Amino acid sequence: MHAKSLTELRAALAAKECSAVELAQHYLKRIDAARDLNAFVHVDADLTLAQAKAADAELARGAGGALTGLPIAHKDVFVTRGWRSTAGSKMLANYESPFDATVVARLQAAGMVTLGKTNMDEFAMGSSNENSAFGAVKNPWDTNAVPGGSSGGSSAAVAARLAPAATGTDTGGSIRQPASFAGVTGIKPTYGRVSRYGMIAFASSLDQGGPMAQSASDCALLLNAMAGFDERDSTSLERDDEDFTRHLGQPWAAGNDAGKPLAGLRIGLPNEYFGAGLADDVRATIDAALKQYEALGATLVPVSLPKTELSIPVYYVIAPAEASSNLSRFDGVRFGHRAAQYGDLLDMYKKSRAEGFGPEVKRRILVGTYVLSHGYYDAYYLQAQKIRRIIANDFQEAFKSCDVIMGPASPTVAWDLGAKGDDPVQMYLADIYTLSVSLAGLPGMSVPCGFGAGANAKRPVGLQIIGNYFNEARMLQVADAFQRATDWHKQVPAGV
């Protein structure tokens, strides 16, 4: 049952091959049996089964929609009523929200059943899911490897088929990179497509929620429910609802030959994504995926994104600056960890934050506070914002000659647990291909396209697909065409 996609599970429910309760029970058993992966931080079988029973009642009445009764896991950065919402931090270890995040509420309104909350890097700051206060997550493909971050719990859960789908968030690559490392499909929509209301903030001008699942078609189904205007989020974009599944299985252009469904599609290949730093085995796997696209009729076009290398310093000025502001609310007064012993009020603030935040969060708060301080604001923060605009303009120039941009989601496959923990700069460099997309606010996704070589032969590689603003439906069409021609997205770790 767990090998089925969301679309297949929906058909099974409709044919009464299983009930929503039976489906939920099946996944709950799998979650319990796979505790060693540490993909989940909070599971409540009673809450899950209550939702499943309600879904079965809807289905029995002939009601419900495309997602009714289907299970999903939520990254623990989305607040959920009745479940703890920790953001992977000791600071919020016992926090229970009085309301649901919009993403959670919309998926529940669509009839989906919550399986639990997935592990994550603390406050979404990390690329390996080793920064969680609740322990590191293991990659199901190779338990000596990281699953990526910060949505590593979600990527591991989907890869191990502990859930058919999961929510994630992407600030600088936190959906795409873990999707790549765990061999699943994940999409970061255009900034503002998906409401941030109830998403515990890291960097407000970058944070964006999105789905992670087995396939592009599953992600399209989920995005139909997740996307939409929300007046409670000041950055939410007011646009007409659209069906993200509408191009799936369709040729790129009317009249295309069945064997060349993507004829007319121009794929931009940035020179900067294929230079020094890209591992040979990743390059070979990406090249093979691009040849598959050529076989489907697409044309490869060289493009340039000249400021790609500046995306790392720009991101690590802007994101920590916003984080230092957002995380100032966690002081042990209204909610969050409070030190047991302290002197005056200022001492309580200091000790509560020192005890509640982990090392990486503290590092980024310090960096952010520094770049926003008097005398450095103009030199660092304002300069970074100017370069951010140039990076966005570079993408628009590239899109004049192509329809989508492709390249690796990460320069390497997943690394060993603990391999980069003592070198934050090396960890930051792992996001070189995803950061610029986030800085520009563009949609991007990762699609499984193969594996590494030699010692990395069990570690997946993800192909990144980047689209222009609001072009998610076309990106999903392009990804879906690849997945109809290949089976990388259907492969599972040994023993699953």
Curated annotation (Swiss-Prot):
<dbReference type="InterPro" id="IPR000120">
    <property type="entry name" value="Amidase"/>
</dbReference>
<keyword id="KW-0436">Ligase</keyword>
<dbReference type="Pfam" id="PF01425">
    <property type="entry name" value="Amidase"/>
</dbReference>
<feature type="active site" description="Acyl-ester intermediate">
    <location>
        <position position="174"/>
    </location>
</feature>
<dbReference type="GO" id="GO:0005524">
    <property type="term" value="F:ATP binding"/>
</dbReference>
<feature type="active site" description="Charge relay system">
    <location>
        <position position="75"/>
    </location>
</feature>
<feature type="active site" description="Charge relay system">
    <location>
        <position position="150"/>
    </location>
</feature>
<dbReference type="GO" id="GO:0030956">
    <property type="term" value="C:glutamyl-tRNA(Gln) amidotransferase complex"/>
</dbReference>
<comment type="function">
    <text>Allows the formation of correctly charged Gln-tRNA(Gln) through the transamidation of misacylated Glu-tRNA(Gln) in organisms which lack glutaminyl-tRNA synthetase. The reaction takes place in the presence of glutamine and ATP through an activated gamma-phospho-Glu-tRNA(Gln).</text>
</comment>
<keyword id="KW-0067">ATP-binding</keyword>
<keyword id="KW-0547">Nucleotide-binding</keyword>
<comment type="similarity">
    <text>Belongs to the amidase family. GatA subfamily.</text>
</comment>
<keyword id="KW-0648">Protein biosynthesis</keyword>
<dbReference type="InterPro" id="IPR036928">
    <property type="entry name" value="AS_sf"/>
</dbReference>
<dbReference type="InterPro" id="IPR004412">
    <property type="entry name" value="GatA"/>
</dbReference>
<dbReference type="InterPro" id="IPR023631">
    <property type="entry name" value="Amidase_dom"/>
</dbReference>
<dbReference type="GO" id="GO:0050567">
    <property type="term" value="F:glutaminyl-tRNA synthase (glutamine-hydrolyzing) activity"/>
</dbReference>
<dbReference type="InterPro" id="IPR020556">
    <property type="entry name" value="Amidase_CS"/>
</dbReference>
<protein>
    <recommendedName>
        <fullName>Glutamyl-tRNA(Gln) amidotransferase subunit A</fullName>
        <ecNumber>6.3.5.7</ecNumber>
    </recommendedName>
</protein>
<comment type="subunit">
    <text>Heterotrimer of A, B and C subunits.</text>
</comment>
<dbReference type="GO" id="GO:0006412">
    <property type="term" value="P:translation"/>
</dbReference>
